[in-house]
């Protein structure tokens, strides 16, 4: 297993960021990192903090939603996949599910590094780019969870079930989202 910083590997950054990749700070819904990995396993090192609203994130492998997690405070290694065919290339997206939490100035989610037993391949940028500006629906609020849920909590935000992300996928575009519940 070898550890790589984001700037050391071919990648695409999704969403508006501060322009830095070491670490890559994720602010907005559906912001994230996309890489192509030829290897049997991939781990991501994430750093997170918050006082009220914990960030949530998802892994998408080969275009399919794979898993979703709450970010733990501090810096942690998380397995994206393991035990897969080391000869095939896997397209991986690490995606922030929650919106920018203006009510929690400590809210933070950063991708610090990647670890794999393989190598990274170039990621082809999409020809189209869409940007959505909106409110709670655009932030993915309520796009996951039981229909009866009415609590306003981070775990009910989801980028994968979001109309902006679905629209971009339908037309083969990259997506940027600037939105805030209100």
State the predicted function of each range:
Residues 164-174:
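Short helix-loop-beta junction
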Residues 173-182:
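A short beta-strand-loop structural module common to alpha/beta enzyme folds
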Residues 154-165:
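Short catalytic helix/loop segments, enriched in acidic residues and glycine
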